[in-house]
Amino acid sequence: MFRTTKSRVVEKNQNFSSASFESLSYPTRLNFYKKPPVSEISIEEFETWAIDRLVVLGEIESAMLRNKTKNELNGIIKKILDKRLPMSSNMARTVKGNSLDEERRKDHYSHFILRLAFSRSDELRIRFLRAESTLFRFRFVNEETRERQAFIDSLDFQWESVSQEEKDVFYEKLQASSQRNIENESFFKVPFFKVPDLVERRAVFVHKGYAYVPFSEQVSLVVEEFEENLKKALESTAKSLPRLDEDDRLLPILNHLSKGFVAPESSIVAPKSGAITAGQVDSFVSHFPLCAKHLHEVLKRDKHLRHFGRLQYGLFLKDIGLSVDEALVFWRKSFTNVTEDKFNKEYRYNIRHTYGLEGNRKNYKGYNCQQILTGPQLGPGDAHGCPYRTYSVNNLVSALASMGIAPDSAGCREVVEAVKARHYHIACTRVFELTHPNVGSLEESIHHPLQYFQLSLES
């Protein structure tokens, strides 16, 4: 499926399904992903394409969990697709040429890569299915009429058309369920369980186990077919995963992808070093996310932070513009119980190391939310990590109260419910919205402490 400089691994890991090796074409932007990709791609493409799609699905899931309206959700999907997974219509072929097929190829491969990653548990499969179905619905609704019809024709659904005679027999009932003029409307019928949302809304007439679906409601039926197809494919993929575990190059990547939605770090630009001084840090704390605020408070209280806390907080301060010289001043003043000699011996080197001035000279970046969530577990005296994950409910409610979110408020309950469901980035996003009412609802969820800080400063 992908290439390396050493060997091919296509044959060994081709079991997305039993499809034969054949050239795949993409006549439209819509895809039921029935045929797996079989040509080689590089490991870099494998990872990059998967991460781009992961970000798209992550924003879709976030928007749905935050109860965005239909219009808000569509706006979020369009924005993130244009940035991460754009696909042009056939009308652009004369302009884009081969790049149009490359866009569709990336979409095809990235779906199957994530299908592998998210087939590993029932919970992951459900999340993947929900997000992919929402993405497909958006694309289907917004596709051009001619391309949409060409796609439907290619699927051979074998829908049973309703004759004019049958339509006349049930005309009044069809009219009542459609709630529109059906004089020029055509209908087809399918088993009622194929369109549960239409049945629930009473948008179709049901007779002898068949739902009479107006052509204008075909979206629901097509999406239902997509979901059913993908659900079966995920179950099939799950059964073949043990064979995939034999490849020690694929496994680490897939494990990483399945841990959660990856933060789109490239969208976050850190301020120039020197933007703030050591003496100004306290005045910026009100703009910190809870993770950084907690570390700052522990540092003030204990005059010290353990290793992982220093690393997490130090890199955050670096991200927001604290230079290495100012960082040395900040930490020296904070560690009031430490002698000058001990500070120089035990802490100075590590601070300079994070700025790329010692050791391997690597210039480290601050941790994103996923890295914080999957970092080292807390030990005695530790303060690093994500408070939404590590705090007890009582401690979380107290922390929210200190930020102006009343314990008995609907907002507090929303945050607590998100935490209980382990949607920590949703909880953080909701806290931002509640503490920045002038900003309103965020289009994208919080996925990086620096993102929170920058949005707060701009508000």
From Swiss-Prot:
Protein name listed in UniProt: DNA primase large subunit
Family indicated by similarity: Belongs to the eukaryotic-type primase large subunit family.
Pfam families found in the cross-reference section: DNA_primase_lrg (PF04104)
The entry's keywords: 4Fe-4S, Chromosome, DNA replication, DNA-binding, Iron, Iron-sulfur, Metal-binding, Nucleus, Primosome
Role, per record: Regulatory subunit of the DNA primase complex and component of the DNA polymerase alpha complex (also known as the alpha DNA polymerase-primase complex - primosome/replisome) which play an essential role in the initiation of DNA synthesis. During the S phase of the cell cycle, the DNA polymerase alpha complex (composed of a catalytic subunit pol1, an accessory subunit spb70/pol12 and two primase subunits, the catalytic subunit spp1/pri1 and the regulatory subunit spp2/pri2) is recruited to DNA at the replicative forks.
Free-text remark on how the cofactor is bound: Binds 1 [4Fe-4S] cluster.
InterPro entries in the record: DNA_primase_lsu_euk, DNA_primase_lsu_euk/arc
Residues in the signal sequence: none
Assembly with partners or alone: Heterodimer of a catalytic subunit spp1/pri1 and a regulatory subunit spp2/pri2, also known as the DNA primase complex. Component of the alpha DNA polymerase complex (also known as the alpha DNA polymerase-primase complex) consisting of four subunits: the catalytic subunit pol1, the accessory subunit spb70/pol12, and the primase complex subunits spp1/pri1 and spp2/pri2 respectively.
GO cellular component terms, semicolon-separated: alpha DNA polymerase:primase complex; cytoplasm; cytosol; nucleus
Gene transcribed to yield this protein: spp2
Swiss-Prot/TrEMBL cofactor(s): [4Fe-4S] cluster
Coiled-coil region(s): none
GO terms for biological process, alphabetical: DNA replication initiation; DNA replication, synthesis of primer
Species in which this protein is naturally found: Schizosaccharomyces pombe (strain 972 / ATCC 24843) (Fission yeast)
Subcellular location(s) per record: Nucleus; Chromosome
Residues where [4Fe-4S] cluster binds: C291, C369, C386, C428
